[in-house]
Amino acid sequence: MKIMEPEIKIVNVVVSTKIGDNIDLEEVAMILENAEYEPEQFPGLVCRLSVPKVALLIFRSGKVNCTGAKSKEEAEIAIKKIIKELKDAGIDVIENPEIKIQNMVATADLGIEPNLDDIALMVEGTEYEPEQFPGLVYRLDDPKVVVLIFGSGKVVITGLKSEEDAKRALKKILDTIKEVQEL
């Protein structure tokens, strides 16, 4: 059985950073366009950008989470945009904060239809209950990620910290499927 090398597509990158201390979210809400701040519903300010298409959650502590980016670089662009707007408005912020990837989500198509029942029976670290969820859940230890494998051959990998991790995880999945389907 020949399996082609599937293309990995990064569909979401979540990063975090710290842009300052004790941020006045009411003031920030008036400065930033597309900012929503409803403290009775959520303790952070939500700012949605269209380019790049991301959502930023800004907290009073100065912590910022950026979600929806397709790469770390895209998230960095979004955070730099916000920092520039706040700095231009006279808010004291850290200009070049350290940006850390918290989670990446990738998808791929294996190009085959794996037998999920066989994989669930023969591979440790898997859960498959088709009455509850159509995908097989496969928890890898290295890289430490969760992989959802569907009968169509589509996979979703969560908990990634890098694209390299995505490649390593996909190789392990393919090797495992080859092994199971050869038995």
Curated annotation (Swiss-Prot):
* Biological process according to GO: DNA-templated transcription initiation
| SUPFAM superfamilies assigned | TATA-box binding protein-like (SSF55945)
- Signal peptide (UniProt feature, chain positions): none
InterPro entries named in the record? TBP (IPR000814), TBP_archaea (IPR033711), TBP_CS (IPR030491), TBP_dom_sf (IPR012295)
Top-rank taxon: Archaea
| Similarity-based family | Belongs to the TBP family.
What HAMAP family is this protein classified in? Answer: TATA_bind_prot_arch (MF_00408)
Query: What is this protein's name?
Result: TATA-box-binding protein
The gene behind this protein is tbp
